[in-house]
Amino acid sequence: FTGIKGVGMTALALCAQDLGKKVSGSDTDEIFPTDKVLKQRKLKPKVGFKESNLPKKLDFLIHTGAHGGSTNLEVITAQKRGIPTLNLAQGLKLFTKDKQVIAVAGVGGKSTTSSMLAVLLDSAGLLPSFSVGVGSIKNLDAPGRFSKKSKFFVVEADEYVADPTADKTPRFHYLDPSIAILTNIEHDHPDVYPTIEDIFAAYKIFISNVPHNGAIIANIDNQGIKKFIKTIDKPVTTYGFSPQSDWQIT
């Protein structure tokens, strides 16, 4: 894992461990919120990015979009050796294959909502897999987990591009969610989305990946979402304080 200390990367590294894979990684020596959980899981990142960091036997390399993304020396070295390389979004797609994905998207509240969902499903005895962009989740003690016993996989779905250097695909376009939860939509990441209409277009593609027997759940209190759901042709279940919501918070 090149850039293993990033929150999304750590979550996937822990999923790989849960699958019984031998995991190694590299990153800078900066302090990260994932340092504690990596230490607990006996994952000691190598400092810096070097050819020698790559084990002789390597099934695949997953890399962050940071630290040069696909132009990182370790990624280039792996490719020269014929080792498959995946960016974080592609790696997440691999881990969520054959799972019932619950994807939480929005400009704000993604981490909190997906963490709450993971805790609730776990408390209900459903033992979900999850990948959330935080240092750790209270009561679960990790930002990521792969559960062979559960069909559910809770994912924080990010609208930013997968790899600024090589793959401008929004990360959440790689997902195939059974359930999509939209917390809010605002104009964000102007380097990628010049206008709010560009963001709406990205969310439309994300929503198009939800099957007709799936579910779209959205916060009707948010003006961006209120405008957005009028533009899609799939049923939406709404929640919020508004009397117009299907599930009203009182």
Segments the model singles out, each with a brief description of its role:
Residues C15-D18, K39, N53-K56, G69-A218, ...:
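Phosphate-binding loop of NTP-binding sites
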Residues P45-F49, L86:
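Short acidic-hydrophobic, aromatic-tinged amphipathic segments that line or gate anion-handling sites
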Residues M9:
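N-terminal Rossmann-fold NAD(P) dinucleotide-binding loop
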Residues G48-G65:
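BRCT (BRCA1 C-terminal) domain core and associated BRCT-interaction motifs
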Residues K21-V37, P128:
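NAD(P)-binding Rossmann-fold cofactor-contacting core
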Residues F1-I4:
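Conserved N-terminal Rossmann-fold NAD(P)-binding element of oxidoreductases
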Residues G6, T28-F32, P243:
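Helix N-cap at the beta1-alpha1 junction of Rossmann-like dinucleotide-binding domains, i.e.
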